Amino acid sequence: MSHEEDLIDYSDEELQTTDAAATTAAPAANGDAAKKGDLTVSGGRPDKKGSYVGIHSTGFRDFLLKGELLRAITDCGFEHPSEVQQVCIPTAILNVDVLCQAKSGLGKTAVFVLTTLHQLEPVPGECSVLVMCHTRELAYQIKNEYARFSKYLPDVKTAVFYGGTPIQKDVEVLSNKESYPNIVVGTPGRLNALVRDKKLSLRNVKAFVLDECDKMLDQIDMRRDVQEIFRATPADKQVMMFSATLSQEIRPVCKKFMRNPLEVYVDDDTKLTLHGLQQYYIKLSEAEKNRKLNELLDSLEFNQVIIFVKSTLRANELDKLLRECNFPSIAVHSGVSQEERIKRYKEFKEFNKRICVATDVFGRGIDIERINLAINYDLPADADSYLHRVGRAGRFGTKGLSISFVSNEEDEKVLKDIEKRFEVALPEYPEGGVDSSTYMA
């Protein structure tokens, strides 16, 4: 399977459970922080404590990453770095320690994956990058991210080690110089066992990464494992830590592992994601949806539109109806064969089609810069899914418009949950429509 396939090879059900709750973080501990949009940024310069030097990047090329990484990024469909990536990557690739708080969906995994791959000069039989996290599922996911971004770096070997599987299999991987990983991802308990038994050597580690660091450093047993592993690595290395939440109490604990880190705290991830997005709802009956959708597509200016429905069957039916009404559309959902789904994804991304009907397969992880209109034909089941859906039309602060159809009591409940979660009062769509300058770049 290609990595492009991997990008959109999700079932609809898998995408219903994602945590996008808002967080509020206090200013950086050293008191000398710079505010950048919804971020608090401080430190990161070895010669001048408390200063911040950054660049505003419109594309990943501005980071001067390896050409092989840029090719992989393009293949994955990512066109612009998120604000967290803009702040962290330029400093991180200079070997500066990083402490970053950012919720899932803001691209923090890509920060350390791209940084470590850019810096890595793989030596056969040597582990140079060590990444730890608190669950097997997250470890496996991170390993897949390394595979995705290292597709044009054939000499880079990555392995994942975690409990619940026979340790002998891990030992076999580490006993063979051909399979010995340059990048190791795993959970603290299993990694500590491999280090203690002298199966895994960390004497050449140049980057030490903790994802969801507060989860590991809060628990005494896990913290002990992390500390023992840390002591097995060289003193001169880069340390990067990331988490969804970083309390005032845990930050000093994290910084004990670091030297004057760049500190990045997202004040409110929901504001960051939805900034620049005009959001409205329309109350109507189920029977009125098709007529209203036709009216909107006729009257609104847009570059590309994505229309979300709740099932593959409804996606096919709506796609057929739109084409019958002379709106050339495509449907993307888990019921479409993998080969056909890739073909349709490319058609949409390359602007050969302007209208896409989708389930939550397209609800997250797809960054297509021309989408500036998102319509919830069927409102999602929860506020988290809403955030990921409408974020397609307001990626990383660009302008966009979202319109949600509210047709029953359950929809009204979800609408109230959305307003409560994101601390906004969504207005009803005005009868006279909206000014295109408010959502067209």
Swiss-Prot record:
CC annotations in GO: chromosome, telomeric region; spliceosomal complex; transcription export complex
Biased composition (Low complexity): 23-32
UniProt-recorded Gene Ontology molecular function terms: ATP binding; ATP hydrolysis activity; RNA binding; RNA helicase activity
UniProt entry tagged with the keyword Hydrolase: yes
Renumbered ranges of motif DECD box: 211-214
Residue span of region Disordered: 23-42
Comment field on protein domains: The Q motif is unique to and characteristic of the DEAD box family of RNA helicases and controls ATP binding and hydrolysis.
Protein name: ATP-dependent RNA helicase sub2
Annotated organism of origin: Aspergillus oryzae (strain ATCC 42149 / RIB 40)
Record lineage: Eukaryota, Fungi, Dikarya, Ascomycota, Pezizomycotina
